[in-house]
Amino acid sequence: MLKLFNRKKKDNKGFTLVELVIVVAILAILVGLLAPQYTKYVEKSRKSADASNLEEIVKELKVVASDPQYSVQAGTYTIVMSHTNGTTITLTNASGTVSTTTTDLWTAGMSSLLEGNWTTATDNLSMSNSDLKLKSNKWVAATGNDAVATVTGNDIGASIVVGADGQMTVKYSPTTLKSGTN
């Protein structure tokens, strides 16, 4: 009988219950340590994508403004990216009036450069479908002098002031958007 028992032990292939419990415990510890880091990484990549999308729209507006074909008016162009409402680019003319002819030109220029289905109106472009919404809903709203007027809540945006001489200044909201620390 002892010979039969010893022979079975030699032929036994596999893991014991204790070994399996130890492996499961090690995996649980690793998941517990790495899961928070993974979620931080995912959120950071979402914010990076949002900042990149906003910067791309700002660059395209600069391209359109520098091309005499599109007759970009002097005024303030406000870009707002929202988690729920998509993206809107709005022109507020310095004189308070918006010329339909030149508005049609800059909206046509922006529509031709930006991908997606943009809806054009007299003084704005908008995209409300899921193509260009914020990926992250954890942005901290800017307050005080740092805020762009129409950027509220967890939205991000930029205000581009085009002077009569064509010079452009850009203000981001929140201001930490440019440095990626928000």
Features from the language model and the residues they span:
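N-terminal leader/signal peptides at the extreme start of proteins
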Residues: M1-K13
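Short, flexible helix-adjacent loops and helix caps
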Residues: N6, E43, Q69-Y70
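Aliphatic-rich helix starts adjacent to a transmembrane/signal segment
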Residues: D11, T39-V58, A65
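N-terminal single-pass transmembrane signal-anchor helix
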Residues: N12-Y38
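Alpha-helix exit/C-cap motif
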Residues: K59-T84
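Short, surface-exposed interaction loops/tails
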Residues: S82-N85, T90-S95, T101-T102, N117-T120, ...
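Papain-like cysteine protease catalytic cores
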Residues: L105
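Long, charged/polar, surface-exposed segments that mediate recognition or autoinhibition
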Residues: G109-M110, L114, T122
